[in-house]
Amino acid sequence: VVEVLHENTFTETKNISDAFNKMLGRMKVLDDSREEFVSNVSHELKTPLASMKVLADSLVTQDQVPIELYQEFMGDIAKEIDRENDIINDLLTLVKMDKTAQNLNISQVNVNDLLELILKRLRPIAEKKQIEIILESFRPVTAEIDEVKMTLAISNLVENAIKYNHDEGWVHVSLNADHKYFYVKVSDSGIGIPKEDQDHIFERFYRVDKSHSREIGGTGLGLAITRNAVIMHRGSIKVYSEPEEGTTFTVRIPLIYVST
């Protein structure tokens, strides 16, 4: 009896020890993730400020700056201010989503109309690069979604499809549904995503082409925001891409929202 009790006590102690070690491991992962995020935020916020300082210092130290150079530098400073503002806005969006993960504003939404409005807003941006945007709706779709968050998710995908595309390219958006889900596909004729990067593109601040990220624009937060919004709807998002052959994102969302 004593041996059995001793064995049971040993087993229970080992189980408690294993559970405690697992908990410590999870806490370390969370802590490391938090430290990395803070480090990334600091770096991203400092970069536009550093650029603005260099430009401003150049203007201050020169006598009789030519008006053309002055205008060019001020234009560059304005772009860096816009970039800083975009980063802050995207960070606030992510923080807000983390805090309100359980507070979706669910309503019956006509998804066809939603996509029409998104593309109407983004067409002028596409026209600057002579990119054609095509919408193909296979059927009328009404779903229980948070209209604001879903608009944000789809808008980010279409904006990326325009941003990382070639001039005179195309963006194709399609909507379909079955008895349980609706599906939005966003395809483009753009630069594509290398296979080794595809597992990381939804991470915060991850950029596929870091050498061109500043000239193309973007904060590295758009796809993280999209993924958050999709997951909050109990949905899924997948990517298929080949370098220089374009990219397709497929979003699947339940027609009826089920809270847990």
Q: What are the functions of these language-model segments?
A:
Residues 105-108, 127-128, 132-142:
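Conserved catalytic submotifs in the C-terminal HATPase_c
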